[in-house]
């Protein structure tokens, strides 16, 4: 949580989804955060990680692992090497890709970590 520029991949527009909760909690805590939701393009939410107009330091994966692997591969091409993988978004393929490409991947819950901040 030491980095300020985040992208959350998942259903950031659906109030009942964890991606939405993480996206909004990061904003509340003062982080620069955008959403990545394939098929969606609106304020602060991008169809593709390549469309984000500034450098992302951390990618938070809160999406189906099959879609997540594609996003991780794109992130790697852009030089993003820090990924937080939420429970349910992990897969052996994602973990192996991260290892093979020197990406610092951590499995954990952003909401739990954010709740520790004052």
PLM regions and their residue ranges:
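NAD(P)-binding Rossmann-fold cofactor-contacting core
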Residues: 14-16, 20-43
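General beta-strand structural signal in soluble alpha/beta enzymes
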Residues: 35, 85, 105-108
